[in-house]
């Protein structure tokens, strides 16, 4: 699970549906992204869209995703 993504969404006070709407994707697809089941590696375009939706620098998203992938690799 991408805990960093859930934490960022909750910090902004947004629901999954609200984030999905901001990203112009379906709610089920956003849920899959958040739990990490739909994408092994998150596309840069998705990182840019998340950064815009959460009003944070894209580098913050990149760093969080790198950490997530490193943890995922170390536990595999």
Where on the chain are the PLM-derived regions?
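Short alpha-helical DNA-recognition segment
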Residues: 14-35
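A short, Lys/Arg-rich alpha-helix, primarily the initiator
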Residues: 1-11
